[in-house]
Design a protein with these regions (language model features):
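N-terminal basic, low-complexity leaders that serve as flexible interaction/assembly modules and, when applicable
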Residues: 1-67, 101, 193
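Active-site loop segments of alpha/beta catalytic cores
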Residues: 1-6, 87-217
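Compositionally biased, intrinsically disordered low-complexity regions
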Residues: 8, 64, 72-74, 110, ...
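Generic signature of intrinsically disordered, low-complexity segments enriched in small/polar residues
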Residues: 15, 34, 70, 80, ...
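Active-site gating loops and adjacent loop-to-helix segments of metal-dependent hydrolytic enzymes
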Residues: 16-20, 68-80, 129-133
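The substrate-binding groove and active-site-proximal loops of carbohydrate-active enzymes
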Residues: 23-27, 79-89, 143
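Glycine-rich, proline-tolerant flexible connector loops at the mouths of alpha/beta enzymes
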Residues: 47-85, 165-184
Length: 217
């Protein structure tokens, strides 16, 4: 059984009330460690999920990312990705702090290239109403960025691996928006490249989560 920290925990709410923006919490190693371990301490779970978000890559690539109360994620559109890994040092420090105090296996994660790109190129309404016409209209833009983001995702994954995570998950939450051809091109092929890069550094288990992939096409 796995359970990520969140509003079901009073100890989480106590910390959350101190911050206006979740992003501040995602960039504080002490908070990352404490909140990641809250469900483990309360429920005795068999795995710990890193307290973080799939939008850390846009943040480290030049976008302004915020999580205001009651508004959901707000992401400033970017067309050029300048990934600065040092911006995510607080995440790796949080991982190291967790591993120092807990033997519970720690699961790190990242948003896959396709899902990450959606947040960078499209607004909330477009993401919720993603359709073939919108995808076809933006194919060239997407093609131009998928390979670039595949490398960035691989680098961030290895950053987490080097910090000490025990397993890794790749979230492609928007995989179901694609037909079979584009699913293979923008989700499956990039994921295989990311897995290959991770496996070249570590033999940790890797979990793929292509949401609604069975309904794509």
């Amino acid at each position: 059984l796995m359970r990520q920290a969140g509003r079901h925990l009073p100890e989480y709410i106590k910390i959350r009330q101190k911050y206006k923006d979740l992003m501040e919490m995602f960039l504080d190693p002490e908070v990352i460690a404490e909140i990641s371990l809250q469900p483990v301490k309360r429920y005795g779970l068999d795995a710990c999920i890193l307290f973080s978000d799939i939008l850390m890559i846009p943040y480290a690539s030049g976008s302004d990312v915020s999580f205001k109360e009651g508004m959901g994620p707000q992401v400033k559109f970017i067309e050029k990705f300048k990934f600065e890994s040092h911006k995510l040092d607080p995440v790796t420090k949080g991982i190291e702090k967790i591993k120092k105090v807990s033997d519970t296996p720690l699961i790190g994660f990242v948003g896959g290239p396709w899902t990450t790109l959606l947040y960078c190129l499209f607004n909330k309404e477009e993401r919720l109403q993603m359709n073939k016409d919108l995808i076809n209209k933006n194919k060239k833009r997407i093609d131009n960025h998928i390979n670039e983001l595949t490398d960035i995702v691989s680098n961030y994954a290895i950053q987490q691996v080097n910090a000490g995570i025990d397993a890794f998950q790749i979230f492609e939450s928007a995989a179901g928006d694609l037909d079979d051809y584009l699913f293979e091109k923008w989700v499956l092929d990039p994921t295989l490249k990311i897995v290959k890069e991770i496996k070249s550094k570590s033999d940790i288990p890797i979990i793929g989560f292509p949401r609604n992939a069975s309904t794509s096409g």
